[in-house]
Amino acid sequence: MFKFLVLTLGSISCQAYAEDTVIVNDHDISAIKDCWQKNSDDDTDINVIKSCLRQEYNLVDAQLNKAYGEAYRYIEQVPRTGVKKPDTEQLNLLKKSQRAWLDFRDKECELILSNEDVQDLSDPYSESEWLSCMIIQTNTRTRQLQLYRNS
């Protein structure tokens, strides 16, 4: 399944928001591949791989939260209206967008998980696939949020 995920997501070359911003980049996949390859010995317990993926997810989730906070503060400090007050409409849209993205991310990773033999996060292999999806989705959203500041 991991090969399916990497090949599927690795083949996506869509660009969004900016000419040089790729939806899924090599870093997204390389961090996941590193977790699998560093721990791919036959003797390695899948829980070691899962732990590596969990650490990577925690890292990218922290980066996402930082990017969201920076985008929020940017909108507060540089309102699109030119008026020297926070743009509450745009701040509310950012909040709604983030909530909608969280729902999308969860559904997207459920879809990936549906390809597994055991579609339950209590299964370590399924959880590893789910974490891989979460890492890719989170990195993608982080780049999107960073673009809001740079546009």
What are the language-model segments listed below?
Residues 19-151:
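N-terminal alpha-helical modules
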Residues 11-15:
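N-terminal signal peptide c-region/cleavage motif recognized by signal peptidases
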Residues 1-4:
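Positively charged n-region of N-terminal signal peptides that target proteins for export
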